[in-house]
Amino acid sequence: MKNVTDSFVFLGHWPSAGSFGFNTDILATNPINLSVVLGVLIFFGKGVLSDLLDNRKQRILNTIRNSEELRDGAIEQLEKARARLRKVEMEAEQFRVNGYSEIEREKWNLINSTSKTLEQLENYKNETIQFEQQRAINQVRQRVFQQALQGAIGTLNSCLSNELHLRTINANIGMFGAMKEITD
C-alpha cells in the first residue's frame, strides 16, 4: 500500500511545465484529476470491493440459512414438546380419572367389607347372647330340678316310714310278678 502512495507522491513531483501530472493537493485539484483518480479507484477497487461485498453477502446468507435451520429445528422440537405435553396431559387425565374411580371403588369395597364385618359381629353378638341365655336357662332348670328332686326326696323320706316303704316295695313286686305271668 505504501508503494502505491509513494508512486502517487513521485508523480506529483514531476515537472509541471506542459506535462500531465497528478496534483496531490486536494484543494488545488481540478475535476479532471478527480475523475481520473476516482476512475482508477473504481477500476482497481471494484474487484476488491466486489469480493468484500460478495464475502459479506455469503456470510449473511449463510447466517440466514443457519438461522432458518435453527428456527426449523426449534419449531420441530417445539412441536415434539407440544405433542409430548399433550400425551402427558392425556395420561395424567387418564391417571386422574382412573385414580378417582379406583379410589371410589376402594371406598365402596371398604364400606361393603366394613358393613359385612359389622353384620358378622352383630350375628356373633346375637349368637353369644342366645348361647348365654340358653346356658342361664339350663342352669336355672338344673337348679330347679335339683331343688325339686331334693324336695321330693325330702318329702318322700319324711312321709315314708319303713313300714310304708316295705308295703310299697311288696306291692310293686306283686305287680311285676303279675305282669310276668301275663307275658309268659
UniProtKB/Swiss-Prot annotation:
Pull one GO CC term from this UniProt entry: proton-transporting ATP synthase complex
Q: Could you tell me the keywords of this UniProt record?
A: ATP synthesis, CF(0), Chloroplast, Hydrogen ion transport, Ion transport, Membrane, Plastid, Thylakoid, Transmembrane, Transmembrane helix, Transport
Q: Which GO terms describe its molecular function?
A: proton-transporting ATP synthase activity, rotational mechanism
State what protein this is by name.
ATP synthase subunit b, chloroplastic
A Pfam match? ATP-synt_B
The record describes the protein's role as: F(1)F(0) ATP synthase produces ATP from ADP in the presence of a proton or sodium gradient. F-type ATPases consist of two structural domains, F(1) containing the extramembraneous catalytic core and F(0) containing the membrane proton channel, linked together by a central stalk and a peripheral stalk. During catalysis, ATP synthesis in the catalytic domain of F(1) is coupled via a rotary mechanism of the central stalk subunits to proton translocation.
What is noted besides the main data? Answer: In plastids the F-type ATPase is also known as CF(1)CF(0).
Protein family membership? Belongs to the ATPase B chain family.
- Origin organism is Carica papaya (Papaya)
The superkingdom listed in its UniProt entry is Eukaryota
Question: Is Aminoacyl-tRNA synthetase among the key words of this record?
Answer: no
Where is the chain membrane-spanning?
27-49
- Does the entry feature the keyword Plastid, yes or no? yes
State its location(s). Answer: Plastid, Chloroplast thylakoid membrane
Entry membrane topology: Single-pass membrane protein
Assembly description:
F-type ATPases have 2 components, F(1) - the catalytic core - and F(0) - the membrane proton channel. F(1) has five subunits: alpha(3), beta(3), gamma(1), delta(1), epsilon(1). F(0) has four main subunits: a(1), b(1), b'(1) and c(10-14). The alpha and beta chains form an alternating ring which encloses part of the gamma chain. F(1) is attached to F(0) by a central stalk formed by the gamma and epsilon chains, while a peripheral stalk is formed by the delta, b and b' chains.
The record's InterPro entries line, in alphabetical order, gives: ATP_synth_b/b'su_bac/chlpt (IPR002146)
Gene name, please? Answer: atpF
